[in-house]
């Protein structure tokens, strides 16, 4: 399973579901970096040093960081989804589809609502 680093705004219920699925998830809060306004570039650098991929819903900024620097532990950029368990399952499936995470940008999107 994957070693992940959840940024400050990442939903804690999703973190808990990912842990149940067997992933090693460290949160910004657990790392002692909460409420410090740590720049995204430093979040990415910390994760790389810790050999972890970043979990984020801050897609725009982290996609830009990936384009500027592909040498990182991986970025999993998710759309917002209040169905925490479904989001965790999509993240898990996206991770399982990859051989490794370093240097990768993985986008996890909420499925479109069914048309009626």
State where each predicted segment sits.
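Basic, amphipathic alpha-helical patches used to engage nucleic acids or provide basic targeting signals
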Residues: 40, 50
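Acidic, PIN/NYN-like endoribonuclease modules and their adjacent C-terminal/linker elements
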Residues: 1-8, 12-20, 26, 35, ...
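Acidic, metal-binding active-site segment of PIN/NYN-like and related structure-specific nucleases
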Residues: 52-65
